[in-house]
Design a protein with these regions (language model features):
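Aromatic sugar-binding surface patches on proteins
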Residues: 58, 124-154
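Short beta-strand elements
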Residues: 176-192
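Sequence contexts marking disulfide-bonded cysteines in secreted/extracellular proteins
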Residues: 49-51, 56-58, 167-169, 185-189
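Enriched for extracellular/lumenal, surface-exposed ectodomains of secreted and cell-surface proteins
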Residues: 114-127, 170-177
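Short, surface-exposed binding/anchoring microloops in extracellular/periplasmic proteins
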Residues: 28-120, 179
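Internal, hydrophobic beta-strand segments that form the core of beta-sheet-rich folds
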Residues: 146-154, 158-176
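Secretory targeting and sorting signals
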Residues: 1-25
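Short structured motifs
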Residues: 45, 151-155, 185
Length: 192
């Protein structure tokens, strides 16, 4: 009886090892918040998603106020500065990135002014930093940014799908007696 059980276990193990699970796109989301008052928070949301079939990672960020009535945009007298940092876990990987701020506008690789939202991208050896300045408040959609990046190996010039991908963001928000900066929200993912 024990031999039969051992043979069955060996057959099951062989089946598992010869038919590994298929990999899908890897995605991760992070959220941070800072209280404005007992009923209101400023939130920063970040999502990172790497797609193996495209050798490309995508990121999006959203900033909003959360009130007892739910998420909402910012008041009309708002001034805000958001920083997005895109990087890899490997110092030998640089990011070939583009972004839209606010989301839905044409992709940028340098900087732009869309709807009084000024943005600029700074490239370094192994990361990309996007600075977005908002003049005036509005709905949540105004405070969304998105983009994509191909993590590229310095030595080969080919996409690097082995290292982890990080998308991090924080925002400083100033309006009517409020001047607060959210903690940094970082989403980390891989290609598998």
């Amino acid at each position: 009886m024990n031999r039969l059980a051992a043979a069955g276990a060996a057959a099951a193990l062989t089946a598992v090892l010869t038919h590994p699970a298929t990999a899908t796109a890897a995605s991760n989301t992070a959220t941070t918040a800072i209280p404005v008052d007992p009923a209101t928070n400023i939130e920063m949301h970040v999502t990172a998603n790497c797609v193996s079939a495209e050798n490309r990672c995508y990121f999006d960020t959203t900033a909003n106020l959360t009130t007892p009535d739910g998420p909402t945009g910012f008041p009309g007298d708002t001034w805000a500065r958001q920083t997005i940092t895109i990087r890899s876990s490997s110092r030998d990987v640089w990011q070939e990135a583009s972004y839209s701020a606010p989301s839905g506008n044409p992709r940028e690789v340098k900087g732009a002014n869309h709807e009084n939202v000024l943005s600029k991208m700074y490239k370094a050896i192994n990361n990309v930093e996007i600075s977005i300045t908002y003049f005036g408040g509005g709905p949540i959609e105004r405070f969304k940014a998105d983009g994509d990046s191909v993590p590229t190996d310095w030595a080969t010039g080919r996409p690097n799908t082995q290292a982890a991908f990080f998308a991090c963001s924080q925002i400083q928000v100033v309006y009517g007696g409020v001047n607060l900066t959210t903690p940094t929200a970082c989403a980390q993912t891989t290609f598998n």
